[in-house]
Amino acid sequence: MSLFALFYMLFAYLLGSISSAILICRIAGLPDPRQNGSHNPGATNVLRIGNRKSALAVLIFDMLKGMIPVWAGYYLGLTQFELGMVALGACLGHIFPIFFQFKGGKGVATAFGAIAPISWAVAGSMFGTWIFVFLVSGYSSLSAVISALLVPFYVWWFKPEFTFPVALVCCLLIYRHHDNIQRLWRGQEDKVWAKFKKK
């Protein structure tokens, strides 16, 4: 990697470190997502403890954190491997944010945003997998884990030169879902729409 690419990856990490869930909850007067619900600063938890508008705002912001640096990297002349590492940097920032004691979200939306400029076919396959599993199961976490397991194969099929960095991103996603995987195994994971059924 070039020196410029390393600094640009650092920029992507810093951008990823801006936790939209925490900031939007503060602005909207909602509880701290790190202390309520699933204790995860992400769109799904904001939906649990807040409302659809706030959750949608978090989702869009988190996707843009990954999408903007990768998309801009194309025009800055970064190599394919460097673009993949920029995507990894953005996801690392979201998961381990320097501005919030390195305690961040799961990284799914940011990973989707980072992968989209790399390949819309891969992004579409990832989104389709997530939606299918979610509609069948009702578990956002299960949808994310299965998507993360399959995305490296989608990348290998459509854009093989990005397989290694994207596989690293997916390993991070699965690692961040280890608590969810244990709850799923024990049958203790909450379905996303459970909140709305209680109303």
From Swiss-Prot:
Reaction(s) the record says it catalyses: an acyl phosphate + sn-glycerol 3-phosphate = a 1-acyl-sn-glycero-3-phosphate + phosphate
Classification via InterPro entries: G3P_acylTferase_PlsY
Keywords attached to this entry: Cell inner membrane, Cell membrane, Lipid biosynthesis, Lipid metabolism, Membrane, Phospholipid biosynthesis, Phospholipid metabolism, Transferase, Transmembrane, Transmembrane helix
Membrane topology of the entry: Multi-pass membrane protein
Keyword Lipid metabolism attributed: yes
PANTHER family, per database record: GLYCEROL-3-PHOSPHATE ACYLTRANSFERASE-RELATED, INNER MEMBRANE PROTEIN YGIH
Subunit comment: Probably interacts with PlsX.
Name of this chain's protein: Glycerol-3-phosphate acyltransferase
